[in-house]
UniProtKB/Swiss-Prot annotation:
Name recorded for this polypeptide: Imidazole glycerol phosphate synthase subunit HisF
Organism of derivation: Oceanobacillus iheyensis (strain DSM 14371 / CIP 107618 / JCM 11309 / KCTC 3954 / HTE831)
GO cellular component labels: cytoplasm
Gene Ontology BP, a term: L-histidine biosynthetic process
EC category: lyase
Family note: Belongs to the HisA/HisF family.
Highest taxon above the source species: Bacteria
Pathway in which the depicted protein is active: Amino-acid biosynthesis; L-histidine biosynthesis; L-histidine from 5-phospho-alpha-D-ribose 1-diphosphate: step 5/9
Reaction catalysed by this enzyme: 5-[(5-phospho-1-deoxy-D-ribulos-1-ylimino)methylamino]-1-(5-phospho-beta-D-ribosyl)imidazole-4-carboxamide + L-glutamine = D-erythro-1-(imidazol-4-yl)glycerol 3-phosphate + 5-amino-1-(5-phospho-beta-D-ribosyl)imidazole-4-carboxamide + L-glutamate + H(+)
């Protein structure tokens, strides 16, 4: 059995790490390079960097910040936001990312997933899905930083993304984002059941029990932001707890 992964997320706006609730009420948190170094040293399994306004502002990603972060860490590094072409993907990978997360552009042109997988490999191509419940047991895909409802069913989109060559899926539960009431298990487990590639749960972590709850299912990794940023949960302590709960996670290196 593969070890489950613990993944801190840096939501970056204008070169600073920020955090909000349900994709709104954005507050400044910290310098991304310093935070990245801290998570690398604490034993995070991976790091995610989202330029959260790039897509909505129709601009490219902050490659200079990506480069600075990449130089300071020795763990897998996923980058997303404002990625619309294979040229963008090439630039992000060249800047030090190991994986690229595609969201809005994939919805607008699904062929981008296929092109990325063919050119750079499925292991580099991650489909990120911002999903919101619009009826009981039905979730739609939202784009442009969660601002626009596409009307596309999230579970069907995950299956389509896999068929196009995505090697992994991040499920961002918009209703749970920043609420700290737990991950959206119905949504995330439904997607994990529907596909045969790794699924990362995102949105809602508030305590260590929430990590146990989500990783007890067929979900490969748990992504979180504010609980790590504000030292509410320490990664070494979280990993110790999960191992005690018989959930396989990589041992802390420090």
């Amino acid at each position: 059995m593969l070890a489950k992964r613990i993944i801190p997320c840096l939501d970056v706006d204008n070169g600073r790490v920020v955090k909000g609730k349900k994709f709104l009420d954005i507050q400044d948190v910290a310098d991304p390079v310093e935070l990245a170094k801290r998570y690398n040293d604490e034993g995070a399994d991976e790091l995610v960097f989202y330029d959260i306004t790039a897509s909505n502002e129709q601009r490219g990603i902050f490659l200079d910040v990506v480069e600075k972060v990449a130089k300071e860490i020795a763990i897998p590094f996923m980058v997303g936001g404002g990625i619309r072409t294979t040229k963008d993907i090439h630039q992000v990978l060249r800047s030090g990312a190991d994986k690229v997360s595609i969201n809005s552009a994939a919805v607008q042109r699904p062929e981008l997933i296929f092109e990325s997988a063919q050119k750079f490999g499925s292991q580099c191509t991650v489909l990120s899905i911002d999903a919101k419940e619009i009826a009981v047991g039905k979730w739609n895909v939202f784009i442009n930083g969660g601002r626009k409802d596409t009307g596309i069913d999230a579970i069907e989109w995950a299956k389509k993304g896999e068929s196009y060559g995505a090697g992994e899926i991040v499920v961002n539960a918009m209703d749970a984002d920043g609420e700290k009431n737990g991950y959206n298990l119905p949504l995330t487990t439904a997607i994990a059941t529907a596909v045969n590639i790794p699924v990362i749960a995102s949105g809602g972590a508030g305590n260590i029990q929430h990590f146990k709850d989500v990783l007890s299912h067929e979900i490969d990794a748990a992504l979180a932001a504010s609980v790590f940023h504000y030292d509410e949960i320490k990664i070494p302590a979280l990993k110790t707890y999960l191992n005690e709960q018989e959930i396989s996670v990589r041992r802390n290196s420090k």
